[in-house]
Amino acid sequence: MLSASAIYGADNEIYVDQSGSGANIDLEQLGICNIIGGINSTAGSLTAFDLDGTTMTLDINMIGATNKFLGDINADNFTGLYNFTGGTNTFTIQVDPTNTYSTDGSDQNIAVTGSSNTFTLNQGTTALAASLNLDWIIQGSNNTVTSNINIDGATNYMDIDGSDNAVTYTGTGVNASAGGYFYLDHTGGQRTFNISQLSTQDNDWLKIISVGGNAASTVCVIQNDQGTSTSC
């Protein structure tokens, strides 16, 4: 079942409440101050953006500035394709935070062209993101990315071109098969990277290539397998 509506005014808003399996949802917004909501929605008191089920595909295109993409996704074998063109946009997504469907087999691709955007993606905070394939392609400056993943064989790849970008990534995992791969390829000026891989019963892998930067740049990497608490 899919319930969707658009509200037109100073802002365009899309309300989506999907349950079931096999859904293929394609949403596009052009302009400024639009919302696909969701968590902490404002403007016309928008709620929902809630996807529940399995084997779903969500394709989002937001073209413009100061737009918001907010919500909860509870799905196994989920494909998310997110394209943002413009600046000062907000992306806040939780994937199965209560372990309703688990978060296995997800494939998520986030493409960003623009500056001063804020992205938060939390996947499997109490579930396991088994076989997750997560790709970030970011072109622009002053973007902020925060991601927390309960990994189980997850791959997190980031390709960032631009200056003054900040990345905070935490990968946790507690079962014997947990283990994640994180790869960051960066070209640009000043940057702040804080990477934590915290699998307790398996190996983690990490590769960072960064070209550019200055004395104010910070790169902090922590790999901790039930060891003594560490910090940068």
PLM features: residue spans?
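Long, low-complexity, polar and repeat-rich extracellular regions
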Residues: 1-232
